Amino acid sequence: MRKVILFGLLLYVGVATAFGQKSAVQVFGVPFGSTYEEFLTAFKEKGFTGKTYIYEGGSGIDVSSIYGTFMTYECYIELRATKLTHTVYKIKISFSVTDKYKDIPGMEQCRAIISRFEEKYGKATLIQKMHGGKVVQDLEESSAAIWHLDDKIDLELFYRGFDDCKVTYGGKEALDGIFQKEVDQYNQQKAQEIQNQLSGSDF
């Protein structure tokens, strides 16, 4: 009888420990390992439709794929400079969140992009807002965007989850050619093209 009780206690502790580890890392309150439907329900309960908002002063997050414990997001940083009156320079950041932490090589690229922007147009100001958190700035020391999130996303996971960082609308081509173009006109044209593509998109 004692062996049965001991086995039961060990089983309970093992299950509780495993569940606790699984629940420790959450995205919008949903633990990793949850099904696609569970993620989808959680996002929709928070009023998120899955569309990307590009052009109304700020941008949103586009959840481009949710595969079990692997989620890929896309969001947009907007930079406004002191030497420009209304021009906004948009940077697209794609990052992956998994249950296995990884390094964030994309952050160095982000810093380089922002530094190049500041060399050309003056001090940059981040004006982007995002679903589930907000962006604040630390441009004085590192010219890097510091992400300050509320409790909906684990901060450490978010930092370690960066997978890639690119300039919006064209990747390397945009990075190499953006300074030879009228930035505002370029962004408006590309934003309209993407917005047209996304106009009917949802989960």
Kindly label every feature range from the protein language model.
Residues 4, 70-72, 82, 171-176:
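Short, structured coil/loop segments at alpha-helix boundaries
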Residues 15-20:
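Sec/Tat signal peptide C-region and signal peptidase I cleavage site
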Residues 21-60, 95-203:
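Non-cytosolic coordination micro-motifs
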Residues 62-111:
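Mid-chain, structured segments of secreted extracytoplasmic proteins
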Residues 4-14:
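Sec-dependent N-terminal signal peptides
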